Regions:
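Short, small-residue-biased leader/transition segments that mark boundaries at the very start
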Residues: 1-5
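Acidic/His- and Gly-rich active-site-bordering loop/insert found
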Residues: 6-93
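Generic secondary-structure signature for well-ordered alpha-helical cores
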Residues: 7, 11-15, 31-36, 118-125, ...
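Alpha-helical scaffold segments in soluble metabolic enzymes
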Residues: 8, 25, 112-115, 144, ...
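Flexible, glycine/proline-enriched loop segments at strand-loop-helix junctions
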Residues: 12, 16, 96-105, 165-166
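A generic local structural motif
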Residues: 33, 48-50, 116, 141-144
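Histidine/acidic-residue-rich, glycine-tolerant segments that coordinate divalent metal ions
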Residues: 47, 124-181
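Active-site metal-coordination/substrate-binding segment of hydrolases
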Residues: 55-126, 131, 136-137, 143-153
Length: 181
């Protein structure tokens, strides 16, 4: 997992509204493994891996994350977050970025999903990875993605706030328009 995240995802700039490169990386990942995939005009991606032998009748599982990251940097950092990959520091099991945010929200979900989809030794039902764009700026990708091809009824949102904590729900958003007279 660390290798996928460290070497590939962090090398691809993926701020909100500029997810095309990471989206295309996900499509290439699916193509290389002969997995079914969908990419829409906003660059949302769905990757489907059919069930392994013996799990064909098991209920499909939807894995969900988002591909954009919050791009912040220290005042002395001259990195162009729209164009440059991250400079990583690895200290044992810990990965951090030099002078910038790491993009762990939600790069870790993307890395986990890719590691799961890439591992043929894991027995599994049909897996459906839904990876949306522009979550950090209002869940825009999630609001407009066509999920009609999904068969799963259970979704595992992998965008949690704390390491080592499994969340039995997910963050949500709501907007209202109020007119006062």
């Amino acid at each position: 997992l660390g290798d996928v995240y460290k070497r590939q995802i962090c090398n691809i700039p993926h701020p909100s509204y500029k997810e095309e490169k990471i989206s295309n990386y996900l499509v290439d990942f699916a193509k290389e493994r002969k997995l079914e995939y969908y990419q829409d005009s906003l660059n949302n991606v769905i990757i489907i891996k059919e069930a392994s032998k013996g799990y064909e009748d098991a209920a499909p599982i939807i894995l969900q994350g988002h591909m954009d990251m919050v791009c912040e940097k220290t005042p002395d950092c001259d990195k162009n977050m729209d164009e440059d990959g991250l400079d990583l520091e690895v200290n044992g099991d810990f990965i951090s970025a030099k002078g910038t945010t790491l993009g762990g929200d939600d790069g870790i979900a993307v890395a986990y999903a890719l590691a799961i989809l890439d591992d043929d030794s894991i027995a599994h039902p049909r897996l459906e990875f839904v990876c949306t764009v522009s979550e950090e700026v209002g869940m825009e990708g999630a609001s407009s993605i066509d999920v009609s091809m999904l068969k799963g009824k259970k979704l595992l949102n992998m965008d949690s706030e704390e390491e080592g904590i499994m969340l039995a729900s997910c963050a949500g958003g709501c907007s209202s328009r109020v007119t006062l007279k």
